[in-house]
Amino acid sequence: MERKVFLLLFVIVLLTLPGFMSAAKKEIPYKRQKFPKKSQCIEACANALTNGDKSKITDVKSRFYKCICYYNP
């Protein structure tokens, strides 16, 4: 039973790994707010990196006066 669980976890990790590896990471300054909301970061990242295409943004993280963007180029 343990082997099946480990095998299943290993397969899941292998299937999700390419999605994380292909995403590019970039920091975007956000001067309007100390800790911007996620929706504000998504919009700022989309405008700065993908010409407004929000579907290419995979994840964002809010930091002190900046947004960390993960996107598919």
Curated annotation (Swiss-Prot):
Compartments, as annotated in UniProt: Secreted
Stretch forming the signal peptide: 1-23
Keyword Secreted: yes
Principal location class: secreted
Keyword Disulfide bond recorded: yes
GO molecular function: toxin activity
Swiss-Prot/TrEMBL keywords: Disulfide bond, Secreted, Signal, Toxin
Tissue: Expressed by the venom gland.
Post-translational modification: Contains 2 disulfide bonds.
GO cellular component: extracellular region
Family: Belongs to the scoloptoxin-15 family.
Name the record gives this protein: U-scoloptoxin(15)-Sm3a
Origin species: Scolopendra morsitans
